[in-house]
Amino acid sequence: MDITVKELSKNYGEKEVFKNFSATFKGGKTTVIMGKSGCGKTTLLNCISRLTDYNGEISGADGVSYVFQEDRLLPRLTVYENLEITLNDFKEEEKISKIKQILSATDMTDKATKLPEELSGGEKKRVALSRAFISSGKTILLDEPLNSLDLGLKRKIDEYFLNFSESEKKTAIYVTHDVDEALFVADTVIILDKGKISWAYDFTTDKKLRKITDDESVKVREKLINLLF
């Protein structure tokens, strides 16, 4: 199901972030949002997830999982238990299979019995991402989810996200400043500027077949760099 935003308006005190903003995010696809700091990226995610009040209409965002810039793990639960609580709708065998799969994909199998306080910042981020990936909801909002991770792990998690979001038909809205990351995961990329969409692009190449060196990727990369930096 598409996520539809109609005539969204949002102020923080005297600061106007959005005024009559409208957009459609395609169901089962990943839309990457980019833009300079303060353009409204995080505010838009907060509105879609109903974490803040707003004027306007937002529909289609059901069963939302939100990966914040900071991890929000339950401190008294182990890594395994933090993942397990998102899977109440699944049978026990399915729970075990999903958790084992995501722990392996994120190199966290040996951390399953650890508490959050025993993890590094990057490890906590991986658990937070994993929890969103395996939830039963069909909408994932990601706010710069891989900032604290090294490049190799970023690409590994992006690849898992790519496969999992497609197989589970997840609708994802993914905020990042990393152009290469956007090229890797996006079906559509948009740039926000002062609460408006200043540029948007729908990829024609299947992202599973896409390479950074493809003509389309090179063209989009150059455009993004020119507009953002």
Predicted regions and their residues:
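Conserved ABC ATPase "signature" region
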Residues: 93-111, 161-163
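Catalytic Walker B motif of ABC-type/P-loop ATPase nucleotide-binding domains
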Residues: 140-144
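ABC-type ATPase nucleotide-binding domains, specifically the catalytic core motifs of the NBD
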Residues: 53, 81-96, 105
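Hydrophobic anchor residue at the start of the ABC signature
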Residues: 129
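Conserved ABC ATPase signature
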Residues: 115-119, 123
